[in-house]
Amino acid sequence: FLVYDPENPRWEGRDRFFLDPGHMSPMLYSTLALTGKFTLDELKEFRQWGSPTPGHPEVDIMRGIENTSGPLGQGHTFAVGAAIAAKFLKARFDEVMNQTIYAYISDGGIQEEISQGSGRIAGALGLDNLIMFYDSNDIQLSTETKDVTVEDTAMKYEAWGWNVLSINGNDP
């Protein structure tokens, strides 16, 4: 569903996908491999020193990686910034720059204050060109999320002005 030009990965009008939890890089690399951006041999080098497939992705526009992952919440913030920039470009150049920005975030990342601020500003600005996939599996690095937070994330985002759609990702 991403609009992009495989012959011109740097095309400014492309949709963008930002991965917040870098540990989900196998998902990203395998998807990009299906588009020819990585070979099976490169996937086999996952997390090896000097590999093109490190444990946390590093920006490589030519291969479809829009952001280097680092502190949790950073990918969420990159996506919000890109959505703001895309809105500016669309206002200036109309449909030529009609981009959709996608982000994949996780329970651990959503707890970070940088992510909270991004969520608030995106809702306040009404960024309808930003779609965020939130992996709400109630697990973070070393514990269940209920051990550190009791908030209803969907309600919080709705209060910030987001259109929230809840999907049971475990429904066979």
Which residues does each PLM region occupy?
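Gly-rich Lys/Arg/Thr-decorated short loops/hinges at beta-loop-alpha junctions or inter-strand turns
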Residues: 56-65, 97-101, 131-141, 153-162
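General structural signal for secondary-structure boundaries
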Residues: 38-42, 149, 172
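A short, conserved beta-to-alpha structural element at the edge of catalytic cores
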Residues: 112, 122-149
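Conserved thiamine diphosphate
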Residues: 91-97, 145-171
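Glycine-rich, histidine-containing beta strand-loop boundary motifs that form or position
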Residues: 21, 105-106, 134-136, 168-169
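Cofactor-binding active-site loop characterized by glycine-rich and histidine/acidic residues
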Residues: 1-125
